[in-house]
Amino acid sequence: MITVNVDLGERAYPIHIGAGLIGRTELFAPHITGSSVTIVTNTTVDPLYGDALRAALAPLGKRVSTVVLPDGEAYKNWETLNLIFDGLLTERADRKTTLVALGGGVIGDMTGFAAACYMRGVPFIQVPTTLLSQVDSSVGGKTGINHPLGKNMIGAFYQPQAVIADIGALTTLPDRELAAGVAEVIKTGAIADAEFFDWIEANVDALNRREPAALAHAVKRSCEIKASVVAADEREGGLRAILNFGHTFGHAIEAGLGYGEWLHGEAVGCGMVMAADLSVRLGLLDEASRQRLDAVIAAAHLPVRGPALGDARYMELMRVDKKAEAGAIKFILLKRFGDTLITQAPDEAVFATLAQTTR
């Protein structure tokens, strides 16, 4: 087992990474101080890992309940969030009840938001079961739900007590979900660590094959990088925004097609292709680096051309992105691997990128 720490002073917490961790009682025990636990999971994950988690919690002598939600990005909304509150109130959960998010990014985001809101804040633990959630969404305290007009527009910054990333859970991931997680790994290397990006290029096939050593290193290094960024800028006042490379175009794709049509990581992968194209057009990135990024995204079996939503629709959706200010779109662009720039771009350059990178 590897442990990476997120250094946030009194709110610091560990990220435990390894195989078989869902069943290890001792990893949960220090973070559950109340008399009850509510597991939040979904219809896909509960049959796979719910019993193992409940068995791990049983020796603690707590009252354990489970809320099972429908699976998918399409359910990341108010109605589904209320199902969590229904379960907590039915079980008479109190301020010391610990929520445990067992699932991917949707479950983690909604459970964290519910924890932030219920009785104005109760503790929660992240148990991410997808590659994307292990390398990205479970770390850093971003929680929330979608709105029809924009992704993740309603939420809170609320840190977990711990993240328990069991890479054994990645063996049951569908291929599309695995590729979606590799997209966030690629993003992390591209924005923050050129040496890690080189490693990803050399090992993308090993990740596709789910080789345990490759997956463990990808999760570890991605978490180390994200932990350092979050420690420096917890609430995205500046530096943390670089983690949104590919997300401005990507969120527009997700909202434009309808949430769940493309997986989040698929949209981010394509969004990176689009952002790299724009980076070249603005004279920030060299063409050879753009081609390297495109090639590794394609090698991860991710889409490299966006849907034809139309220029006006893309611009409309990107203007409601969380990074936008006074309607001005801000892009995270690459200067070189490991070096980014947050900037606006002329509409003409954006239109040229859309013409080149969409169907």
From Swiss-Prot:
It comes from the Bacteria. NAD(+) binds at residues 71-76, 105-109, 129-130, 142, 151. Disulfide bonds: none annotated. It catalyses: 7-phospho-2-dehydro-3-deoxy-D-arabino-heptonate = 3-dehydroquinate + phosphate. GO terms for molecular function: 3-dehydroquinate synthase activity; metal ion binding; nucleotide binding. CDD domains: DHQS. GO terms for cellular component: cytoplasm. One of its GO terms (biological process) is chorismate biosynthetic process. Zn(2+) binds at residues 184, 247, 264. Pfam families: DHQ_synthase, DHQS_C. Its EC number is 4.2.3.4. Its cofactor is Co(2+); Zn(2+); NAD(+). Keywords: Amino-acid biosynthesis, Aromatic amino acid biosynthesis, Cobalt, Cytoplasm, Lyase, Metal-binding, NAD, Nucleotide-binding, Zinc. Pathway: Metabolic intermediate biosynthesis; chorismate biosynthesis; chorismate from D-erythrose 4-phosphate and phosphoenolpyruvate: step 2/7. Binds 1 divalent metal cation per subunit. Can use either Co(2+) or Zn(2+). It is found in: Cytoplasm. Belongs to the sugar phosphate cyclases superfamily. Dehydroquinate synthase family. Catalyzes the conversion of 3-deoxy-D-arabino-heptulosonate 7-phosphate (DAHP) to dehydroquinate (DHQ). This is 3-dehydroquinate synthase. It comes from Burkholderia ambifaria (strain MC40-6). The lineage of its organism: Bacteria, Pseudomonadati, Pseudomonadota, Betaproteobacteria, Burkholderiales.
